[in-house]
Amino acid sequence: FATVDYRGEPITESTSFSSFCRMARNDGQLSLRCKSSDAFGSIQAAVMQKPSVYFCPCGLLEVAIPIVVRGHYLGGFIGGQVRCSDAPEDTSRLEKVMAPAAIEGIIEKNKDLLEQLPEYSFEKFMDIVNLIFLIINQLGENEMHLQMRWEKQQKQVKKLYSLNQKLAEESAQKDLKILDLEASR
């Protein structure tokens, strides 16, 4: 998993990548394709403001889930990297457009790592995607509400502090007047 900005650049540490994906992201030829794939998914998800499901250049099913709070795109969550043989034909397949011949040898050499990846039906994958989308965006909304409430409380604290200062000054002035009155007797 990785959280990325709209360009596909990671903004958090990537976690739980498979051995195959770690190899690919550390390979000079493949890493740029992985980042481009992340960017493709992120842009699609940002524009549609819903999950974008696609096949990465290595032929693995991935998803970019937009993080949208109050209509504002904040970034994306990239995940998946699973094998899937029953995806609809209209699912974007980046392996067809990102110089597949240049990476075929690398993929073939690491076929054992590729075969270790789990295989999901497209329906099961989409069930997981929809659940994660719901959770991520609910967390974003909750965080936004907490932030707004904190800001409101900070404004109230400032008002109370100002009022307290004003009352303290008024009290000090009244104390001085009382002292003046007592001194003039």
Regions found by a protein language model. Name each.
Residues 29, 120-123, 169:
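A general boundary/transition motif marking the beginning of the first structured unit of a protein
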Residues 1-59:
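Structured interaction and signal-relay segments at domain junctions
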